[in-house]
Amino acid sequence: MGNRTLEGCHVDSRMDHLFPPSLYIFVIGVGLPTNCLALWAAYRQVRQRNELGVYLMNLSIADLLYICTLPLWVDYFLHHDNWIHGPGSCKLFGFIFYTNIYISIAFLCCISVDRYLAVAHPLRFARLRRVKTAVAVSSVVWATELGANSAPLFHDELFRDRYNHTFCFEKFPMEGWVAWMNLYRVFVGFLFPWALMLLSYRGILRAVRGSVSTERQEKVKIKRLALSLIAIVLVCFAPYHVLLLSRSAVYLRRPRDCGFEERVFSAYHSSLAFTSLNCVADPILYCLVNEGARSDVAKALHHLLRFLASDKPQEMANASLTLETPLTSKRNSMAKAMAAGWVAAPLAQGDQVQLKMLPPAQ
């Protein structure tokens, strides 16, 4: 399949060849090592039968796949929005790039709901917080998002304009089917999970306020972490979806109006690049803030430094592997909550819960 040459809008590609690639390079440098550490820490959480680790692991995998596409997008922007790697790579890397946005939002929503169940209903919904359940939910997330965003794989995604720019996965103005797909992405892929996160945060606040025995410092930690879930989605993804919705709505009303597309072109590309910061925020917030994962990462760094400083690296590597053997014994739902850094323990009367952030059981 060749490129399609179309009479498109006159967008100035010279305006955004600095900010997006600079931000992507930063995300590669910071996000790649932190997500590798986050993936390892999440794996250890899964080995300890902690369902939160399943969501963290899937989130890290999605972020790493996304980061692998960034070098080509850096090249694309440095060439002033000119894709030189062929139609096949455009489809593949564009599909991974854009689908990751909604996979990440979905898993952030899963984590938020899981934290709500752990804090507000630690015993009542214990079955929903098993590793098997988390694996099943994660499979549904991947299947749903990959399927819902697969339409571009069956269309040409390279567009050459009259100024000899070869756009990949973007056309100005957009096509009709793309506009309708964007509405689905905004309302179902972004707003719906964000609304669930808001409801989960509200439920967490109620549970924390109703626990008279929970220490004030613990309440602050719980509320901060829950609020950070919402903030990541809002800060990283909201600007992009506001412009995506605006572009789609304007096209559906005035399909041939290029004025709006030309005015928001630079802002749209900047907001799209800003979504990549999610790959930096995810491991820092959900692994390094989590007591169990933070402990695992600290141990990994400690043994890595000892390994690099040792005169007998092989012996140190063997010692590290021995020290880092994960627990394999089965844990009940309360122990899993402790491993995740959250615990909700019934008091003697059974009517209230005491919430604490604790390190994972060793």
Curated annotation (Swiss-Prot):
InterPro entries attached to this UniProt entry: GPCR_Rhodpsn, GPCR_Rhodpsn_7TM, GPR4_orph
GO cellular component: plasma membrane
Keywords (A to Z) from UniProt: Cell membrane, Disulfide bond, G-protein coupled receptor, Glycoprotein, Membrane, Receptor, Transducer, Transmembrane, Transmembrane helix
Residue ranges, annotated region (Extracellular loop 2 (ECL2)): 157-172
Parts of the chain on the Cytoplasmic side: 46-49, 122-129, 211-214, 290-362
Biological process according to GO: adenylate cyclase-activating G protein-coupled receptor signaling pathway; angiogenesis involved in wound healing; glomerular mesangial cell development; negative regulation of angiogenesis; phospholipase C-activating G protein-coupled receptor signaling pathway; positive regulation of inflammatory response; positive regulation of Rho protein signal transduction; regulation of cell adhesion
Annotated TM spans: 9-45, 50-80, 86-121, 130-156, 173-210, 215-250, 261-289
Site feature Proton sensing, where: H155, H165, H269
Site (Required for activation): E145
Localization (cell): Cell membrane
Glycosylation sites (chain numbering): N3, N164
Disulfide bridge partners, by residue number: C9-C258, C90-C168
Regulation: Activated by a network of residues that connects an extracellular-facing cavity to Glu-145, a conserved charged residue buried in the transmembrane core of the receptor. Protonation likely drives conformational changes in extracellular loop 2 (ECL2), which stabilizes movement of transmembrane 3 (TM3) and a series of rearrangements that connect the extracellular-facing cavity to Glu-145, a residue only conserved in proton-sensing G-protein coupled receptors.
Family recorded in the similarity comment: Belongs to the G-protein coupled receptor 1 family.
Free-text note regarding domains: A multitude of proton-sensing residues, which include extracellular histidine residues (His-155, His-165 and His-269) or triad of buried acidic residues (Asp-63, Glu-145 and Asp-282), contribute to activation of the G-protein coupled receptor activity and pH sensitivity.
Stated role: Proton-sensing G-protein coupled receptor activated by extracellular pH, which is required to monitor pH changes and generate adaptive reactions. Activated by an optimal pH of 6.8-7.2. Ligand binding causes a conformation change that triggers signaling via guanine nucleotide-binding proteins (G proteins) and modulates the activity of downstream effectors, such as adenylate cyclase. GPR4 is mainly coupled to G(s) G proteins and mediates activation of adenylate cyclase activity. May also couple with G(q) and G(12)/G(13) G proteins.
Name of protein: G-protein coupled receptor 4
Originating species: Bos taurus (Bovine)
